[in-house]
Swiss-Prot record:
Entry keyword set: Chloroplast, DNA-directed RNA polymerase, Magnesium, Metal-binding, Nucleotidyltransferase, Plastid, Transcription, Transferase, Zinc
Alphabetical list of InterPro entries matching this protein: DNA-dir_RpoC1_gamma, DNA-dir_RpoC_beta_prime, RNA_pol_asu, RNA_pol_N, RNA_pol_Rpb1_1, RNA_pol_Rpb1_3, RNA_pol_Rpb1_3_sf, RNA_pol_Rpb1_clamp_domain
GO molecular function: DNA binding; DNA-directed RNA polymerase activity; magnesium ion binding; zinc ion binding
Name this protein carries in UniProt: DNA-directed RNA polymerase subunit beta'
Origin species: Porphyra purpurea (Red seaweed)
Binding positions for Mg(2+) per the UniProt entry: D472, D474, D476
GO cellular component terms attached to this protein's record: chloroplast; DNA-directed RNA polymerase complex; mitochondrion
Name of the gene: rpoC1
Task performed by this protein: DNA-dependent RNA polymerase catalyzes the transcription of DNA into RNA using the four ribonucleoside triphosphates as substrates.
Keyword check for NAD: no
Cofactor(s) this protein cannot do without: Mg(2+); Zn(2+)
Record-listed Zn(2+) binding positions: C70, C72, C85, C88
The EC number(s) this enzyme carries: 2.7.7.6
Record carries keyword DNA repair: no
Length: 629
């Protein structure tokens, strides 16, 4: 089997020269024949259902449809590897080469690339220092442009002329044979290509640099004209740095992507379904062949120009359907998908297939609230956990001697034996998992949690981490990922664990805050409720005694009681008692609004009582324990 593995350091995207495009598609067969150019618009033969030669699915250019079998069937099997059939000219090799072998279409007339003409910045217009509308007029055969000027005439270089203007000037200018050699006027992509070829990049860059050092002083902000010059300077410098020629923005050769990336498949009823790109390529080849034929029979100029314009529009549709002119539609008036549509957007090749790849050791399920969980925990369904941690479970089963090999371990897992769950519980201890909710708009969109096995099929999530994920429980789904290596697990535990991410990276404010029933519970514990009087005004020797009395239903949660408290009271009323009582042993009792202090004759505190409720004592105890922890 051929090894297609290649190592590379980086990927560079740049303009491709016509020679480079030919190089992509051209191949030399073992018999010395060079193939690669597509000349026919046919796809497959309706009788034999085999690809047509020199067509869009040609086996000679792209390789055989069946492994190790030529087009005519003379050579079959692996033993004929590398042989080129003398009857059909197909090389005997694997069919998977049709996934990467390209071809090309040699155009009878140059056409501009619609991305560089009608993009957000028209690079062709910027490079030529023309307006976008002016370039469009030239490309689509509405106006002529002077590609070479002469001192004897009033025509300037890159000046646009309407058709009737050029007709009236043509006879006058070309009367003299000498002037005929000096002035040139062009139309269409050929004229644009000539103008781009004639650009002296070094000279233009030097001129623009001089202008950049002397910006206009009349305005505080740079003018639009100055900004355009700076944009042009950046573009010219990029051309110089990359070694690209501006004329490469005009096609003379069109690349054709491999046939297995634009397949044609037979449906049940005998009909065929084909990729939209094949229709675009077919239109281009038909128009290109017609243009070549018209040129060869010396057809009138107006007919040739019309055909060139149609070829330009066909190539525009292939690159970006609907960017300019009428959108090409297929059956049911559905716009056909062009190369741009395949690449761009959420469903495009980059976001869907390259950035959005499915990964191993991951799962997805609906989230439900788990109020019983700790902040660093999440509830993971047992089925999902067993599937995600299967390699770890198998390893542990073999280590414990419950099975001898992987096959036996997998059978044991399939049978759902009870010992599996004990092993799974051991495996997930201290092994964090990553939870992610799309869209991941900031770094808190993916956090680590310690999994707890739960019944059912829903992931349980702590309610306090919902603001960070922007999650709610109305059907939201979350993805689970298992960090495999020890480094990944350590990183997840140290950096990504939910309790370590309580500040918002955007504002620096806490993003984990008590909410909903927690706030209600805190309010209820600390609220005043005069109607609850059971055990009110009783004295207790310690705060713990109050909690015990409440648990035994001796006092109500909101009843005001007096409890001994040896800590420091931070209050403005400490200096101003309501009443002072002096006892026979010169000891003093000071009465305040919410506490009582008894002092001896030397003003040393003997005992202190505070007026509070069992609810507030419970609330204070919880806060104190969490701060100490």
């Amino acid at each position: 089997m051929t090894n297609f593995e290649q190592y590379f350091d980086y990927v560079k995207i740049s303009l491709a020269s016509p020679e480079k495009i030919r190089q992509w598609g051209e191949r030399s067969l073992p018999n010395g024949q060079i193939v690669g150019e597509i000349t026919k618009p046919e796809t497959i033969n309706y009788r034999t259902l085999k690809p047509e030669m020199d067509g869009l699915f040609c086996e000679k250019i792209f390789g055989p449809v069946k492994d190790w079998e030529c087009h005519c069937g003379k050579y079959k099997r692996f033993r004929y590897k590398g042989i080129v059939c003398e009857r059909c000219g197909v090389e005997v090799t694997e069919s998977r080469v049709r996934r990467h072998r390209m071809a090309y279409i040699e155009l009878a007339s140059p056409v501009t690339h619609v991305w560089y003409l009608k993009g957000s910045t028209s690079y062709i217009a910027l490079a030529l220092d023309l307006k976008v509308k002016e370039v469009e007029k030239i490309v689509y055969f509405h106006s002529y442009v002077v590609t070479q000027s002469s001192e004897e005439t009033n025509l300037k270089y890159k000046q646009l002329l309407e058709g009737y203007e050029w007709k009236s000037l043509e006879e006058e200018i070309y009367q003299n044979q000498d002037e005929n050699n000096q002035i040139e006027v062009g139309i269409g992509a050929e004229a644009i290509q000539k103008l781009l070829k004639d650009l002296d990049l070094e000279y233009i860059a030097e001129t623009l640099r001089l202008e950049a050092t002397n910006p206009p002083k009349s305005f505080k902000t740079p003018s639009l004209k100055f900004n355009k010059k700076m944009k042009r300077l950046r573009l010219i410098e990029n051309f110089i740095a990359t070694g690209a020629d501006p004329s490469w923005m005009v096609f003379t050769v069109i690349p054709v992507i491999p046939p297995d990336l634009r397949p044609m498949v037979q449906l049940d009823g005998g009909r065929f379904a084909t990729a939209d790109l094949n229709e675009f390529y077919r239109r281009i080849i038909n128009r290109n062949n017609r243009l070549s034929r018209l040129k060869s029979i010396l057809a009138p100029e107006i007919i040739i120009r019309n055909e060139k314009r149609m070829l330009q529009e066909a190539v525009d549709s292939l690159m970006d359907n609907g960017r300019r002119g009428r959108t090409v539609v297929g059956a049911n008036n559905r716009p056909l998908k062009s190369l741009s549509d395949i690449i761009e957007g959420k469903q495009g090749r980059f976001r869907q297939n390259l950035l959005g790849k499915r990964v191993d050791y991951s799962g997805r399920s609906v989230i439900v609230v788990g109020p019983h969980l700790k902040l660093h925990q999440c509830g993971l369904p047992r089925e999902m956990a067993l599937e995600l941690f299967q390699p770890f479970v198998i390893h542990r089963l073999i280590l414990q001697g419950l099975v001898n090999n992987i096959k036996a371990a997998k059978k044991m897992i399939q049978k759902n034996e009870s010992s599996i769950w004990n092993v799974l519980n051991e495996v997930i201890q201290g092994h964090p998992v990553l939870l992610n909710r799309a869209p991941t708009l900031h770094r808190l969109g993916i956090q680590a949690f310690e999994p707890i096995l739960v019944e059912g099929r829903a992931i349980k999530l702590h309610p306090l981490v919902c603001p960070a994920f922007n999650a709610d429980f109305d059907g939201d789904q979350m993805a689970v990922h298992v960090p495999l290596s020890l480094e990944a697990q350590a990183e997840a535990r140290l950096l990504m664990l939910a309790p370590h991410n309580f500040l918002s990276p955007a504002t620096g404010q806490p993003i984990i805050m008590p909410s909903q029933d927690m706030v209600l519970g805190c309010y209820y514990l600390t609220a005043n409720n005069p109607s609850q009087q059971r055990g009110a005004s009783q004295y207790f020797a310690s705060l713990e005694d109050v909690v015990i009395a409440y648990e035994k239903k001796k006092v109500d949660l909101h009843a005001y009681i007096w409890a001994r408290f040896d800590g420091v009271i931070d209050s403005d009323q400490v200096k101003f008692p309501i009443k002072i009582e002096t006892h026979h042993d010169n000891s003093v009792t000071k009465f305040f609004d919410n506490h009582i202090i008894k002092e001896d004759a030397e003003h040393q505190r003997i005992v202190q009582y505070i007026r509070t409720t069992p609810g507030r004592i419970i609330f204070n105890k919880i806060i104190q324990e969490s701060l100490v922890a």
